[in-house]
Each structure stands twice: as structure tokens, then as C-alpha cells.
């Protein structure tokens, strides 16, 4: 199952958090979800010209305002001179949403190991007629040098302008998709070339994460686990067992 499912969704609530962190049980929840989608598309398109390298966008909502955390490889391109770019972006999003928008920019320390940035970099090279093999191998080498424990890249489409579409992939290191505590970053990007669209999928393994959120497991589940293991503290001893043993010995 781990080979088919999205690795990000498979690890939600365990080692991966949601990109939309808010709760609403009103009938307008669908409109807010759609608004989050519009915000992400607008920010991506707006900052693509600046080549800021947006890894992910996290949206938090309150009753009065919307807080947007932008994880960027080049935070200076998002902020601009004296904060002009970020102020303009905040005002534009306020007009779209009708609420006050606060934007925080977080720097991505290792952009070479971010699956989204790797996919966008390969897509940019393919659109500029760079060999797909060269782009994939170069991205793998950069990721492994930056500290990734494993990476897999898969490109599908009319590679190299071929008449028949095909898929090719390159892999280095290990990608444990079934291990939930394994921090596997995943992204899917589309490159628009002259021959047609090329789908790019990237898996990056960054190591294991020790899950410290034991409170996520309910107490009754912990009791069941202890009972299965035969824990003496969770399972009281039956005094009749001693009597049976004594009768057998005698």
C-alpha cells in the first residue's frame, strides 16, 4: 500500500502536519477550502517570476485574520527591498479574501533536499530543452551531497521529444515508503514542453523521525497493547492459578 499512496498523506498526523491548520464546522467550509487553493495558486504564480523557490505554503485562520507561512529557498525575493514585495502581496491577498492577511517568510535551509523544489528545477530545465537524464542525475547528486539518505525521480511523457511516450526513473539510496516514521518528502510537478506535458515525481528520504506524540494514541489502545504483550501491571494475576500449580506439584 505504501507504494501506491501519497507519502505525505500517509504520514499526516504522525510525523507530518497539515498545510491548512484551521477548523470550521459551518456550511461555508467548502468556500474556505477553495479559498486556500486560490491563495496557494496566486502566491505560487506571483513569486514564480521572482524565482523565490517556494517549497510549501501553510495557511492558518482565525476569526479576524489569515496567517500565511511561506517556506522559501530565497526569502529575500519574497520580502523585497524594505519589505515592499511582502506588503504588496499582503494587500493583494486581502482584496481576494476580504480579510486581513499576515505573511511570515521561513527560509528553507537545504533546498536541494526539498522534493517540490527539485521537481520545479527539473521542470524548468526540461522546458528549456535540457536533457532529462542530465537534469535527473544532477538533481540526485545535489540531494545526496546535501545530506539526503535516498532519492528517486520519475519522469513520464514524450521524453526527448520521442514519438512514443515512456517513463524513466533514477534512484540512489533507500526510500522506505512502508515505514511511517521515515521522513519521506514527495512532490509531483508538470513540465510543459513543446512535445507535450511531462510528469515529474520526486521522493526524498531524509531519515527517521522519533515520534514523541504518544498522546495521539488513545489510552484504551495502550491498554490493549499492554494486554497483548502480557504486561503484569496491566493484567492482574488470578489467584486460582497458584492453587492449580500447587495441586499439580503435590
UniProtKB/Swiss-Prot annotation:
Keyword match Iron-sulfur: no
Membrane-traversing stretches: none
GO BP field: translation
UniProt entry keywords in alphabetical sequence: Ribonucleoprotein, Ribosomal protein, RNA-binding, rRNA-binding
Domain KH type-2 stretches: 39-109
Matching HAMAP family: Ribosomal_uS3_B
Protein known as: Small ribosomal subunit protein uS3
